[in-house]
Amino acid sequence: MAAPTVEGAAVTALRSVLHRVRQAAERSGRTQEQIRVVAVSKTKPVSLIRQVYDAGHRSFGENYVQEIVDKAPQLPEDIKWHFVGHLQSNKAKTLLGGVPNLDMVEGVGNEKIANHLDKAVSNLGRKPLKVLVQVNTSGEESKSGIDPSSCLGIVEHVRLRCPNLEFAGLMTIGMPDYTSTPENFRTLLNCRAEVCKALGMAEDQCELSMGMSGDFEQAIEMGSTSVRIGSTIFGPREYAKKQQN
């Protein structure tokens, strides 16, 4: 009886999150439909993901290559998978080959990763892959991502040197304790303004993926177009064994 209770709780939690997203969107002068909610399902079983899928959700995220490659074939093809973890360059081919319905890679933090993804897309004959450039807005050495001062350079590299990638926007991960969240998000907003001005893009053509379980409402109020929600929907992570990227 325990499993149905947990799965029911995930669907209830999803509806609560979507309600909060709608309220935050309205406070920022937008609609819920303008905000993507990526349900991050790392360490969670396929059966639980299926429950959330059956409730109408379609955007899901995973942090580990092996996990998403294992799960994706067991789930419906109309899921839009987002890879939201740190991607090692030698895993790009495995990721793309194993997940035909991979919609986006969030977290291109250097030219090497961009080049490997571009080559993998070309070799597999896939349509151009949407990517977000990851910006390290908190300055933490433990985090991936480009320094804000180098953001424009890698965006230009993706747009000019990677014909099989589609630059879709920017992403960042705030501080774990959310102490500097407003500053982190403001930095990403500044990066977007710089990129759009330099490239002649409208700002609404450049997505902002910022905001997680503990700060997604504030992120939306500050302009986020995509939030990554894991534990608030699925419950605490279950690390039965060490995950490998």
Regions found by a protein language model. Name each.
Residues 75-77, 242-245:
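Short low-complexity, flexible loop/linker segments enriched in glycine and/or proline
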Residues 224-242:
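Gly/Pro- and small hydrophobic-enriched strand-loop and loop-to-helix capping segments
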Residues 2-214, 222, 234-236:
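Conserved alpha/beta-domain cores
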